[in-house]
Amino acid sequence: MAKKIKDDADKNAETTKKEVLLEAKEEIHKLRNEFERESRERRNELQRVERRLMQKEESLDKKSETLEQKDDRLSRKLRDLETKEEEIKLLYNKEVQKLEELSGLTSQQARELLLSDVEKEVKYEAAMMVKDIETKAKDDADKKAREIITLAIQKCAADHVAETTVTVVQLPNDEMKGRIIGREGRNIRTLETLTGIDLIIDDTPEAVILSGFDPIRREVARIALEKLIADGRIHPARIEEMVEKAKKEVENILKEEGEQATFDTGVHGLHPELIRLLGRLKYRTSYGQNVLKHAIEVSHLAGLMATELGADPKLAKRAGLLHDIGKAVDHEVEGTHIEIGMELLRKYKETKDVIHAMSTHHGDFEPETIEAILVTAADAISAARPGARRETLESYIKRLEKLEDIANNYDGVEKSFAIQAGREIRIIVKPEVYNDDEIYMFAREITKKIEADLEYPGQIKVNVIRETRAIEYAK
């Protein structure tokens, strides 16, 4: 039994030994193949390097040969030039001698005569040179100015989105359209009357279009409508409540936008009311260009150019940011936006330098500081950039604003809204000023005024609304 176990163990040992030897041979064979492969690759690489070196050597030999040939040619040309120089000297001396004999002048006398003529010529050339230097200086100044402006524009890569006159509000389903319209249209009429915005409800799936030229009113209408949709309760009283909430929310947005603008431009220490007015510029457009984004861009451009020219970048940025501040209220106060802006800056204690730099950007006043010139230039650059402004939208908005101004100039008008793309104006009058009979005559008077003062296609509907409310509380 012990012998059998021993024999089995010997056999197993022999088998294991053979397996180990076989694995070792395979590993050796594998390593040998890998070594040969690496050796071949290295030999190939060395051959490639050797070929490249040989090619470079041949190239250098050719270049060396070419340089030697050029050197020989230059040496020959130099010798030829030296020979010709000697010949020219001989000819020159002979010609001088002949000229002295023919003219009866010595070389000294001829030299003095020549110097006199040369002096006149040099004076003329000097005058021309001064003129050329002046022209070159102007060209260099123009070039430097273009470089500074280009650098400022490249550093200030502001994005602009062309503003439109419509906003789309998404609905959860098309059934919501009926609830927004309300029984006999009372909900939609209430919302349009309170906001001054047209609600266009058509076949567009799950969407209502808000149309109006005043972006602030449109934003109030959007927020109010979205709140009503989310709340689910849509009736005139709830609409009034949501419109009031939306107005407060928009006021908060104005403040946040103004603060963000001062943060983005690095302009600090502004009066809170100026910050709020800056926020209002987010909802103002000039030829389709967002006025707040335009003001931020002007601030950046003016600051960058001031830095390049060694002027005061903080002053330039501050004046650039505030240069259109008058546009935040120019439809509420009489005067140009520059006059209004100057009055606002004086009211809120801005420095004379800031007011001056802001006041000159349309050429109403002569710029007296480099910062004022830079604000004017930055304003022109921002406005002139291709695609920044659209004339047709601006003229359309101005026509609607003029339509509202006609109504607002009458006493007893609480507010007015130009809607339906200017085809209708809704005028809400104070009930204590006009009675029910008088509003018909008032509507007729407004109609005649519009016909006299405005040019418009088609016809304009004048809708005068008089509303009386009696409120008591049961205790």
Curated annotation (Swiss-Prot):
GO molecular function annotations of the record: RNA binding; RNA endonuclease activity
Pfam families attached to this UniProt entry: HD, KH_1, RNase_Y_N
Domain HD: 291-384
Start and end residues of each stretch annotated as Disordered: 34-73
PROSITE patterns according to UniProt: HD, KH_TYPE_1
All copies of domain KH, residue ranges: 165-228
InterPro entries in alphabetical order: HD/PDEase_dom (IPR003607), HD_domain (IPR006674), HDIG_dom (IPR006675), KH_dom (IPR004087), KH_dom_type_1 (IPR004088), KH_dom_type_1_sf (IPR036612), Ribonuclease_Y (IPR017705), RNase_Y_N (IPR022711)
EC number annotated for this UniProt entry: 3.1.-.-
Matches recorded under SUPFAM superfamilies: Eukaryotic type KH-domain (KH-domain type I) (SSF54791), HD-domain/PDEase-like (SSF109604)
Single biological process term from Gene Ontology: mRNA catabolic process
Function: Endoribonuclease that initiates mRNA decay.
Protein name: Ribonuclease Y
Organism: Alkaliphilus metalliredigens (strain QYMF)
